[in-house]
């Protein structure tokens, strides 16, 4: 609200309004004051928005002028630089023409010199032969597996267990009871 009006001042204003207007018309008066304040605030915000738009527009105009000035300055600098480049190229050509050297443009350059033949690479004196790659175990033939088995003799052959039969167990238990 207003920074100059405190709580005490608001109470005094409310008491005077109650006495002057009366309790019957006070709610209607408060509603009209609220509507008036809303209109004032909306008008102030519209004014502020239009003022901000004008400020932005003037800033944009200034920026546009600066950009145009920079563009003109750059193109002017480019034409000056282009003139200086052509002048320098002309000076170089004149000085080389006095010596008897001809300049060729890079696009018209042809290589007339043949490159020297490549020198043969020296071979190393002794290079170990590379080991052959191992084959996977699944890919080995079965014939190769037999000599390995013969090369490694088994220490002792275990006897095969006898097959168990149900009748045999019953006989042993019956025989031990006798």
Swiss-Prot record:
GO terms for biological process: protein transport by the Tat complex. The keyword Transport applies. It is found in: Cell inner membrane. Residues 104-178 are annotated as: Disordered. GO terms for cellular component: TAT protein transport complex. GO terms for molecular function: protein transmembrane transporter activity. The chain crosses the membrane at residues 2-22. The keyword Membrane applies. It is a single-pass membrane protein. HAMAP family: TatB (MF_00237). The Tat system comprises two distinct complexes: a TatABC complex, containing multiple copies of TatA, TatB and TatC subunits, and a separate TatA complex, containing only TatA subunits. Substrates initially bind to the TatABC complex, which probably triggers association of the separate TatA complex to form the active translocon. Belongs to the TatB family. This is Sec-independent protein translocase protein TatB. It comes from Phenylobacterium zucineum (strain HLK1). The gene is tatB.
